[in-house]
């Protein structure tokens, strides 16, 4: 037996601690896997909750869009033809499209006919939107012009001349509307949420053949912007702060 051991070597005894050593590492790895699994599940739950909240806001936004559009149409449907006005459901823009009624060429002063329209339109417009205040972020009075400008040196010069004109016109419209006696009780809300924006010729209207429709390009719109995008940004920001 001694010779056998000298030739082949002494058989090793199993180290009792070896099994314990590998068992400890296995337990550690299993524990780490469970930790990572719980982290992944927590992240998935958070992502699903964020998705559901954004989806809920998107649905609410769509419902608000439809509700505001239907409210405007219910209030003004019979007036649209005689004002040559139009309500866009996608942008919630109330558009006045008769340039000869709105302003004289190159002028920022509101014509008498448009003043009469605003006298009738603006107080009712505010009253219609009153119930949707909580979902409105801003209401823009937008001024648009054609690309024409008599005496312009080039297209750039015409663009900036029309920019000044469109901004002046929207300020005139907003100031006139703000000063109406029937709006006294809503003036703080008007100051907080209304803005006058001039777009110059950056959003011209095109004919079917692709040419500029100069008359339709000269227009004034009242556009409602809801706060859905703001709410979504707030959700994303809150999640970043929590993470």
Model-predicted regions and their roles:
Residues 90-119, 148-161:
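Short, solvent-exposed beta-strand/turn patches at coil↔beta or beta↔helix junctions
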Residues 1-83:
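Short terminal targeting/anchoring segments
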Residues 112, 144-233:
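Periplasmic OmpA-like peptidoglycan-binding domain that tethers envelope proteins to the cell wall
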């Amino acid at each position: 037996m001694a010779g056998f051991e000298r030739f082949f070597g002494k058989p090793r005894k199993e180290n009792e601690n070896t099994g314990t050593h590998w068992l400890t590492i296995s337990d550690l790895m299993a524990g780490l896997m469970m930790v990572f699994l719980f982290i992944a599940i927590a992240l998935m739950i958070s992502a699903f909750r964020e998705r559901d909240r954004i989806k809920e806001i998107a649905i609410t936004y769509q419902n608000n869009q439809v509700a505001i559009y239907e409210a405007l149409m219910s209030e003004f449907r019979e007036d649209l033809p005689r004002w040559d006005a139009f309500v866009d459901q996608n942008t919630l823009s109330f558009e006045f499209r008769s340039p000869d009624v709105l302003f004289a060429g190159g002028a920022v002063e509101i014509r008498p006919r448009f003043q009469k329209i605003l006298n009738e339109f603006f107080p009712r417009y505010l009253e219609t939107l009153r119930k949707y205040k909580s979902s409105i972020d801003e209401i823009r009075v937008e001024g648009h012009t054609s690309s024409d400008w008599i005496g312009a040196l080039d297209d750039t010069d015409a663009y900036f001349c029309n920019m000044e004109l469109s901004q002046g016109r929207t300020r005139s419209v907003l100031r006139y509307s703000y000063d109406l006696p029937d709006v006294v009780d809503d003036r703080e809300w008007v100051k907080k949420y209304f803005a006058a924006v001039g777009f110059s010729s950056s959003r011209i209207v095109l004919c079917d053949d692709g040419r500029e429709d100069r008359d339709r390009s000269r227009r004034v719109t009242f556009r409602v912007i809801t706060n859905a995008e703001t709410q979504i940004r707030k959700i994303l920001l809150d999640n970043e702060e929590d993470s």
